[in-house]
Amino acid sequence: MQIIARKNKNYFLWEGFLNGDYCLCYTTEILEEYEEILCLKTNRLIATIVLEIITQAPNTKRIDAHYHWNLITQDPDDNKFVDCAVFANADFIVSDDKHFKELENIDFPRVLVIKLEEFARLYRNIDIN
């Protein structure tokens, strides 16, 4: 969520999302966490606007993660992102959270995690046109 701040060096990634350059997958649990974080860091109005953008954008996919893999043990709350990625058949999760490192040792289901800076590099090198 840090990329939505205009002053953030990776704001161009949010602009890319708004332009439809990549797909964002989410579950209800993920939206609830985003709302909580955005309300703490900004205010309720901004949180509502951002969530509305995410849920209404044509390049988002709402996922019903009806099974919980429970792959991350150090911070089980992070599993909502893993479950979403598995059911969405996502290419990867973008996160700098150290708890996702546990996934490197799990063969099935295989979930790739890349850091925000790596995603920014990949995004810069993709010809969107």
Residue ranges and their predicted role:
Residues 16, 54, 84, 105:
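Hydrophobic/aromatic ligand-binding patch that stacks against planar heteroaromatic rings
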Residues 22, 60, 91, 109-111:
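A structural micro-motif
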Residues 1-26:
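Short, well-structured N-terminal submotif of metal-dependent ribonuclease cores
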Residues 98-129:
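Acidic, PIN/NYN-like endoribonuclease modules and their adjacent C-terminal/linker elements
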Residues 18-21, 25-68:
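PIN-domain endoribonuclease scaffold, especially VapC-family toxins
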